[in-house]
Amino acid sequence: MRKLILLLFTGILLFSCTAVGADEGRILRFIYCSDVHYGLEREFRGKEVGSDEVSRAMLATFKLLSETRLPEDSGVGAGIKFGSPDFVVCTGDIANRMEEGVQSATTSWSQFCSDWDSSISSPLYLVPGNHDISNAIGYSKVLSPEKDASSAAGIFNRMMRPAVERTVETFNYQTDKVHYSFVKDGVRFVFMGMWPDAYMRQWFDQEIGTDTITPVVLFTHDPPIADTKHFTNPNGKHTIN
């Protein structure tokens, strides 16, 4: 039976992970985070700051890992330096809902790219969150503008590399899905967008084919049993609330 590891998290969160690769016992190292929510203000280190400042502080901690030794706890790589990560993962909610006082997804995506591209040398893998897909799924108030696809289109362009890049105007929420995978050191890493719905699960089955041996690590923003407010209304005008 294929080994499947599902990484599902909510809230702002960061952790580093080490795992023994299937090939020659090599140790894989990656950093995972989610829900950076550019555009919000929150209390951080005793004062109210923008989430972009929090993200830059988090990115600074990534660099500290290169010289940080793993705990002497008999775990994988115990006592050795973490070193440079093989890759970094962020599972969405890069932008935030456009309530009054919160910046647009256009500005948030620009800030994210500026901060992360200048700080990370390892490959960066992304999937969108619910706030990227509609910019405000689950938010009951009227938004202005109703939608801003900047972060959704940006993630799609980076990860899917279409022949023609999507723009805010051309991005299609129904068809422009983010899903991809790669195998590294005998482990398959699979990225299934915001939520592993029927479409994503069908793609997953096609992607792995008859491979029942390679271990799988799965990244998605929402768990299979997801919050219904994160989805479009199937009735009426098919609005986001």
Which functions belong to the PLM regions below?
Residues 60-87, 172-176, 183, 188-241:
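His/acidic metal-ligating clusters that form di-metal
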Residues 36-38, 94-95, 131-133, 195-197, ...:
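Short, solvent-exposed loop/turn segments at secondary-structure junctions
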Residues 17-103:
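N-terminal active-site segment of His-dependent metallophosphoesterases
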Residues 1-4:
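Positively charged n-region of N-terminal signal peptides that target proteins for export
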Residues 98-205, 210-215:
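Extended active-site neighborhood of metal-dependent phosphoesterases/phosphodiesterases
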Residues 7-16:
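Bacterial N-terminal signal peptides
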Residues 32-34, 86-93, 124-129, 192-193, ...:
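Active-site neighborhood of phospho(di)ester-bond hydrolases with catalytic His/Asp-centered motifs
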Residues 41-51, 99-106, 137-147, 228-241:
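Short, flexible/disordered intra-domain loops and linkers
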